Regions:
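Glycine/threonine-rich flexible loop motifs
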Residues: 97-106
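Short, well-ordered alpha-helix to beta-strand connector turns
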Residues: 31, 68, 86-88, 116-117, ...
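Catalytic-core regions built around general acid/base machinery
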Residues: 23, 106-118
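Catalytic nucleophile loop
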Residues: 93, 113-133
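A glycine-rich, hydrophobic loop/mini-helix early in the fold
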Residues: 41-97
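Glycine/Thr-rich phosphate-binding loops of Rossmann-like dinucleotide-binding domains
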Residues: 14, 44, 100-101, 130-131
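C-terminal and late-domain segments of enzyme folds
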Residues: 2-30, 36-51, 136-216
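Structural motif
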Residues: 6, 35, 89-93, 121-122, ...
Length: 216
């Protein structure tokens, strides 16, 4: 049975929150293999640093220490795109949603993901891309919020790195929620999707037809 985790974090320095860590420990205790799928497939050095860390960032695999003891770690980008992505855990990294989505579709990883029955981690843009409808909230680079067609493994559309104190982000989510339901997920929270079951870990905000429901 496929389990999908929709996360905002961890970031390059800060790790998982206690609530998310405790949840992951329950489901990753037997996991031995993990495959990371890049959002910057052309930049292998950046991807290596993002996964394994350097003197400036912790690295995703190091954030997972204490949660799981992986024996095999794979990184899939343009240099390693012929690797078999099937593993106990597949991790869609954060970053640029467009380059990751194109890379996944061009290499038909989306078809593999649809038939995959392991644990799927989706962080930030990875969590946006895995949905039927991804959502991009306007920022300094994008003038208008928009939806786009994602991979379609879940109907849960998230707004990652959500801050309820950010009035612009909140008002955009309210406005856009008349088209599709949006879940605001702070960095300390996540959503777990397993078949038709949805579980909120930490504080999550649901936007639906302009209304807001807080789950805690």
């Amino acid at each position: 049975m496929k389990k999908i985790y929709l996360l905002s974090g961890p970031g390059t320095i800060e790790g998982f929150s206690n609530a998310v860590s405790n949840e992951l420990k329950k489901n990753l205790k037997d996991a031995k293999t993990i495959t990371f799928i890049s959002s910057s497939p052309e930049n292998h050095e950046k991807n290596i640093n993002f996964v394994y860390g350097n003197d400036k960032i912790i690295g995703m695999i190091n954030h997972l220490k204490g949660i799981a003891n992986f024996k095999v770690v794979n990184l899939v980008d343009e240099m390693n795109k012929n690797l078999d992505i099937n593993s106990d855990v597949i991790y869609l990294l954060g970053g640029n949603y467009e380059t990751q989505l194109s890379f996944i579709k061009e290499n038909k990883f989306d078809e593999i993901l649809k038939n995959y029955n392991g644990i799927l981690f989706c962080t930030s843009c990875g969590a946006m891309n895995i949905a039927k409808y991804g959502y991009y909230s306007k920022d300094d680079d994008i003038e208008e919020s928009f939806f786009y067609e994602g991979i379609g493994l879940t109907n849960i559309t998230i707004d990652p790195h959500f801050e309820i104190e950010n009035d612009i982000q909140v008002e955009e989510a309210k406005k856009m929620s008349f088209e599709h339901v949006i879940y605001g997920v702070p960095n300390s929270s996540c959503i777990k999707v397993s078949d038709d079951n949805i579980e909120m870990i930490g504080k999550v905000y649901e936007f639906n037809n302009g209304n807001v429901i807080e789950y805690n």
